């Protein structure tokens, strides 16, 4: 049952993403031939007006098929007949909608359940924090030069330091202090300094909106940091990288933990989906935007057949990567 909730939640993220492409395409007068949720063989579909809406067998992915997207067309309503700016807006709309969804969820969670802020509520006796003079009410501003917007930013900073001392910028009253602390591992294998955070139990609307923006911004930053560790080889592919199987398992666990946890995980996945899709890789939205930018710079249209060839190769590589990561999930499961 929880897996069903998880799949429905993930499908909702895809729906929102593709809806972004669909809405902006329609607003720009583009003929949308097909709106699909999922990949692979079609389960069922219905045609409303000029567009066919269908659901496909694999619950990962989706697409909006627009006239002129895969080949050249002389029709004034085709994608290739529109300006580069219009095409970029269409391609970027999916990721934008995922950001908006994450923001709305985080604001809702902050307003309904409260949140922890970057202020110290208490200091554990004989902890690293006490040793360097951290006091109740201190507010963390930076860790190793990186701004702290949420408590997750602080935890990420400790994790990235890998046990090495970190430099903290702290606000105490009207003063800004700089202190260096040596993190220690707790029983869960996570680095800590021995503090608890102050809780905002009944935030105002302004506080909730601010926290929503901070949470979204923090996740975007963490996503790029994670990508960097994968590219540079710092990440352990066995334990730090998960694919479809891991996502389903984690979604199921989130659903089992309750509505708030599932909503938070949905927002988390929504940000990951947005960041991933904006990477400048062929077949992804970011790759298509990159091509449009190149065409704007050289002031010349690249023949559609070449663009389609590049996107086809990119899609095949992505599918191959998904298969490999799925196999990895089965052989070396994270959960």
From Swiss-Prot:
Biological process according to GO: proteolysis
Residues involved in Zn(2+) binding: 17, 21
Keyword Thylakoid: no
Compartments reported by the entry: Cell membrane
Molecular function terms from GO: metal ion binding; metalloendopeptidase activity
Cofactor entry: Zn(2+)
Active site as annotated: 18
PROSITE patterns with a match to the protein in the record: PDZ, ZINC_PROTEASE
EC number: 3.4.24.-
Domain of life of the native organism: Bacteria
Membrane topology qualifier: Multi-pass membrane protein
Limits of the PDZ domain: 96-174
Gene3D superfamilies for this protein: 2.30.42.10
CC per GO annotation: plasma membrane
Transmembrane residue ranges: 88-110, 262-284, 312-334
CDD domains, per the entry: cpPDZ_EcRseP-like, S2P-M50_PDZ_RseP-like
Pfam families found in the cross-reference section: PDZ_2 (PF13180), Peptidase_M50 (PF02163)
Enzyme kind, highest EC tier: hydrolase
Family of this protein: Belongs to the peptidase M50B family.
Entry protein name: Putative zinc metalloprotease CPE1693
């Amino acid at each position: 049952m929880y897996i069903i909730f998880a799949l429905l939640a993930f499908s909702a993220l895809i729906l929102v993403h593709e809806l972004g492409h669909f809405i902006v395409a329609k607003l720009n007068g583009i003929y949308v031939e097909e709106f699909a949720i999922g990949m692979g063989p079609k389960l069922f579909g219905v045609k409303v007006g000029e567009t066919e809406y269908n659901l496909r067998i694999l619950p990962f992915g989706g697409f909006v098929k627009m006239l002129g997207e895969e080949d050249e067309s002389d029709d004034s309503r085709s994608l290739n007949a529109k300006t580069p700016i219009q095409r970029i807006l269409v391609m970027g709309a999916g990721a934008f909608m995922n950001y908006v969804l994450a923001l709305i969820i985080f604001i809702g969670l902050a307003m309904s359940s409260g949140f922890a802020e970057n202020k110290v509520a208490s200091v554990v006796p004989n902890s690293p924090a006490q040793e360097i003079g951290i006091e109740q009410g201190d507010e963390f501003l930076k860790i190793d030069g990186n701004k702290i917007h949420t408590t997750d930013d602080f935890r990420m900073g400790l994790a990235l330091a890998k046990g090495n001392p970190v430099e903290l910028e702290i606000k105490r009253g009207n003063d800004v202090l700089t202190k260096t602390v040596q993190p220690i591992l707790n029983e869960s294998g996570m680095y800590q300094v021995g503090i608890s955070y102050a809780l905002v139990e009944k935030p105002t609307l302004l506080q909730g909106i601010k926290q929503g923006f901070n949470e979204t911004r923090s996740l975007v930053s963490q996503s790029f940091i994670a990508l960097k560790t994968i590219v540079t080889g710092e990440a352990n592919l066995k334990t730090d990288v998960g694919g479809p199987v891991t996502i389903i398992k984690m979604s199921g666990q989130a659903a089992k933990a309750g509505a708030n946890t599932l909503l938070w995980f949905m927002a988390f996945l929504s940000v990951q989906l947005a960041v991933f899709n904006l990477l400048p890789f062929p077949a992804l939205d970011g790759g298509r935007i990159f091509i449009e930018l190149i065409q704007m710079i050289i002031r010349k249209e690249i023949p559609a057949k070449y663009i389609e060839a590049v996107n086809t190769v990119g899609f095949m590589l992505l599918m191959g990567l998904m298969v490999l990561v799925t196999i990895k999930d089965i052989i070396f499961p994270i959960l």
